[in-house]
């Protein structure tokens, strides 16, 4: 059985990608990160996901990205913006962008993949994010894949490492539709940047607005609870 390393955050996208990798019959090795983010609830949500998809092993890596901040998710001095509708969302890189986060995460996943001999790495980047987050674009994924195959022992031995981004051409609406077909229980996910201590989502941060809009377009009630 082929091995995969799946980046798993506890949100809609990574949960859907986990289901896709499971459907493709990979032996899944998941990796999550405690990087100093405001939303620690996402690390609790992954527990149910790894049970459902028979994840072989799950690594939670501690990284202190608060050490240099630069993002509303890792710096308490930067406020999380709140919105009333999807039409208010910014068309520029938002303050919730974490500098180089996907590059850092993929680098850890790459190291893990080399250790266990996995040639497939899965990440949940997609179209809806690519407009605002530079490390969610197709050209970024292609460039990273090219780099890893000249920078690793596996790569120079001809054991090509592939970075899979199966959601790359999908909107959030399409991602949810795909996940539902695969049986993903989105009750076990969270997207909110500032959930309460009892895991209630705020409903008006960028992530919540996009999530609620996507469920609405699918004519489905979001199964998680909001304030």
Curated annotation (Swiss-Prot):
This is 7-cyano-7-deazaguanine synthase. It comes from Rickettsia typhi (strain ATCC VR-144 / Wilmington). Catalyzes the ATP-dependent conversion of 7-carboxy-7-deazaguanine (CDG) to 7-cyano-7-deazaguanine (preQ(0)). Belongs to the QueC family. Keywords: ATP-binding, Ligase, Metal-binding, Nucleotide-binding, Queuosine biosynthesis, Zinc. One of its GO terms (molecular function) is ligase activity, forming carbon-nitrogen bonds. It holds the Pfam family QueC. Zn(2+) binds at residues 192, 202, 205, 208. The gene is queC. Pathway: Purine metabolism; 7-cyano-7-deazaguanine biosynthesis. It catalyses: 7-carboxy-7-deazaguanine + NH4(+) + ATP = 7-cyano-7-deazaguanine + ADP + phosphate + H2O + H(+).
């Amino acid at each position: 059985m082929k091995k995969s390393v799946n980046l798993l955050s506890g949100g809609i996208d990574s949960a859907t990608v986990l289901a896709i990798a499971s459907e493709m019959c990979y032996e899944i090795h998941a990796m999550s990160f405690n990087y100093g983010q405001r939303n620690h609830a996402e690390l609790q949500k992954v527990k149910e996901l790894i049970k459902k998809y028979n994840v072989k092993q799950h690594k939670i890596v501690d990284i202190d990205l608060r050490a240099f901040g630069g993002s509303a998710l890792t710096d308490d001095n930067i406020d999380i913006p709140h919105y009333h509708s999807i039409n208010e969302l910014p068309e520029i890189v938002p303050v919730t962008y974490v500098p180089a986060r996907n590059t850092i995460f993929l680098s850890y996943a790459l190291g893990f993949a080399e250790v266990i001999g996995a040639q497939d790495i899965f990440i949940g980047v997609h179209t809806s994010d690519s407009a605002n987050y530079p490390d969610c674009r197709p050209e970024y994924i292609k460039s990273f894949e090219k780099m890893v195959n000249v920078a690793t022992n596996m790569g120079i031995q001809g054991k090509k490492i592939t970075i899979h981004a199966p959601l790359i051409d999908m909107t959030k609406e399409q991602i949810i539709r795909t996940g539902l077909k695969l049986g993903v229980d989105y009750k076990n996910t969270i997207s909110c940047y500032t959930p309460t201590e009892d895991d209630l989502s705020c409903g008006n941060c960028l992530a919540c607005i996009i999530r609620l809009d996507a469920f609405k377009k699918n004519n489905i009630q979001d199964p998680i609870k909001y304030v």
